[in-house]
Amino acid sequence: MPQLWQGRASKAVDSRVNDFNSSIRFDARMIEQDIQGSLVHSAMLGRQGIISQQDVDDIHKGLHSILDDLHSGALEIDPNAEDVHTFVEQTLTARVGDAGKRLHTGRSRNDQVALDIRLNLRAASEHIQGQIKELITVLCDQAEKGAGYVMPGYTHLQRAQPVTFGHQLMAYAWMLLRDLGRLQDATRRMDAECPLGSGALAGTTYPLDRFYTAEQLGFAAPCGNSIDGVSDRDFCIELCSAMATCMMHLSRLSEEIILWCSWEFKFIELDDAFTTGSSIMPQKKNPDVTELIRGKTGRVYGDLNTLLVMMKGIPLAYDKDMQEDKEAIFDAVDTLELCLRTVTPMLATMTPLPANMRRAAAKGFINATDCADYLTKKGMPFRDAYKCTGTMVAACIREGKTLEELTLDEFKQYSDLFAEDVYTAIDLTTCCEGRTSYGGPTKASVLRQVSEVKGKLA
């Protein structure tokens, strides 16, 4: 397939350069968006009297026929085409003749590709947002069921204070809600400015109606500067950053799932459909889904780094370096979509094991803070109460006891403020339900969080 730009060249381009220069293998996924932009651009050319209405009709008929063939599977994309724009234009011209040659009037591939990427990422962002909402809903449903399942909360991966399974899961729901907001914000900024009509960099001499094309394509307005219009890839970086942050949250959740389903914790059981086995160890039930999410997170970080490094030193306006944006951003999109598609049903089908959680919570003195708070509420300064409780814990460790196993006389050896009600104060359920501060682990708080988060998804 010949290049669109061969008018000046005195020699045919070396085949190795053609192979090196071609982007059709990764930008062909934008073919629907390329056609969408061309339909609107050609309609505008007709409205402005730049091309005839007959040309517009022929162009639209040809573009729709390409779309029909694409959807039916009959369209064969030429792997030798330089890029998706070349393929569409030359396929169109082969079908409708000279009208196809008029499509590119007042347009450059520079503003064309800047538009296509935006349209493609808009659709991708909307799809990912829907996936995140589904995952948040699953987390909320599991949290609602586990709102009363007491488990250890951890700092430094050491047992720290009692929380509930529902409270822990809702932490991830809130993280993902922020991810949803970041994607929405980035998409809103991307949709604020339409680059179509910027030309190669300096606009055009044709009387284009850029406000018409911007409106028809779902943008708030045309971009205010034609050089910025073709040079901008901020939207790729911002969306990729939002996706990388989401992957980070999925990776943290995955790490906890990996721990929780191990025999060392056994807080949950993953459905067999979402685990794998070993070729040599018959007892194994491996959480491969979560391990792959953890690994793929680094891949999306790499995509973001690629975009940042690619853009950091190139002068205005368009440079061929920018062709490398698509593989990075599309890989980030595909990776996040794949992870979300897999992790959501995995979490929906996991089985919590509350008895194991409770047994783990009974170890490690995670009610020590509550013991110190008990003394503080009896009038002892908190720092003294902290020291007193620490001394008690050290003694219990030496003697192989828990705080609950101390007699009242033993408690009183450390402070006369202890009374019979200390046993209620350090009961694990009481510890959770007593933390009534907003956002805490009480059952009522978890259920309120579930309701609030689900309300934000509506």
Located regions from the model:
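Generic, well-ordered alpha-helical scaffold segments in large soluble proteins
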Residues: 41, 62-69, 91, 95, ...
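Positions in alpha-helical segments
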Residues: 40-43, 119, 123, 237-241, ...
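A helix-coil-helix interface module used to build multimeric assemblies
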Residues: 1-189, 193, 199, 203, ...
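Short runs of predominantly hydrophobic/aromatic residues within well-ordered alpha helices
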Residues: 38, 85, 89, 236-239, ...
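Charged, flexible cofactor/metal-binding loops and thiol motifs
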Residues: 117, 122, 129, 144, ...
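Glycine-rich cofactor/substrate-binding loops
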Residues: 1-37, 98-99, 281-458
